[in-house]
Amino acid sequence: MERSDLPPDVVIRRLPLYARSLRYLLEEGVHSVSSQELGERINVTAAQIRKDLSYFGEFGKQGIGYDVEKLLQHIERILGLHHHWPVALVGIGLLGQAIARYEGFRTEGIEIVALFDSDPAKIGQKIGDLTIQDFAHVRRIIAEKQIKMAIIAVPAQQAQRVADVLVEAGIRAILSYAPMILQVPEDVWVRYIDPVAVLQSMTYYLAREQEH
C-alpha cells in the first residue's frame, strides 16, 4: 500500500492515545464514553476524534457514545496490537539499559527480544533474561527471530551506520533516540525521540513570556 493511500500520520499517532485512555476507562469501570468525554482526557476535540475514527469505519451511536471495550478492541486491531511484535534494541549504554528494563512494552503487544552492542565489555552481559549480543551478528539474529522493528539508542555519529545495517537485515520500523535524521528507504518507517529538541521547542514559549 502506498503511503498516500494511508490515513494521515497524525491520525495514526493519536490512536495509541485513544487506546490508552480507553484502557484507563475500563479500569475505572466505565463502559460507555462520548467523544466529548474521551476528547477531554487527551486534549482533542470531539469532532477530531470522530474524524479520526471515520478513516477506519463507523463507531458508536449518536446520543449514546462508544462502547469502551469494543472501541478499544477495534483500535488495537487497527494498530495490529493483536499480534506479538518482537523488537531489537541496539546500543546498551545507560539509555539502552533503561529501555531494556522497561516493563511497559509487553503489555502493549511489543517485546524486546534481542539486545545488541559493539562494546566487547558489554557483549555477553545479561539484562533480565536477555544476553547482549555482538552487533556483528545482528543480521542472523534478526532473521532467526523474524524481527521487523528496532530501537536505536546509540550516539549520533553511529546511528546512520546502524540504521543501514538494520534495514539491510529486514527491519521495517525504527524508533531512534539518536539526535539526527536517518536516511532510509521510503518503505521503512522511522520515529524519533529527541528530548533536547522537545525541550528547545518549549523554551520558545518561555522566552516569549520573559519578553513581556
Swiss-Prot record:
* Gene3D superfamilies per the UniProt record, alphabetical: NAD(P)-binding Rossmann-like Domain, Winged helix-like DNA-binding domain superfamily/Winged helix DNA-binding domain
Keyword Amino-acid biosynthesis carried by entry: no
Membrane-crossing residues? none
Identify the residues that bind NAD(+): 91-96
Q: Give the annotated DNA-binding region, as residue ranges.
A: 17-56
State the UniProt keywords alphabetically: Cytoplasm, DNA-binding, NAD, Repressor, Transcription, Transcription regulation
An annotated GO BP: negative regulation of DNA-templated transcription
Write out the annotated subcellular location.
Cytoplasm
For molecular function, the Gene Ontology terms on record are:
DNA binding; DNA-binding transcription factor activity
Q: Which Pfam families match?
A: CoA_binding (PF02629), Put_DNA-bind_N (PF06971)
One GO term of the cellular component aspect? cytoplasm
| Main localization of the protein described in the UniProt heading | cytoplasm
Instruction: State the SUPFAM superfamilies in the record.
Output: NAD(P)-binding Rossmann-fold domains (SSF51735), Winged helix' DNA-binding domain (SSF46785)
Which SMART domains does its entry note? CoA_binding
Q: How does it assemble?
A: Homodimer.
The record's function comment reads: Modulates transcription in response to changes in cellular NADH/NAD(+) redox state.
Q: Which family does it belong to?
A: Belongs to the transcriptional regulatory Rex family.
* Descriptive protein name: Redox-sensing transcriptional repressor Rex
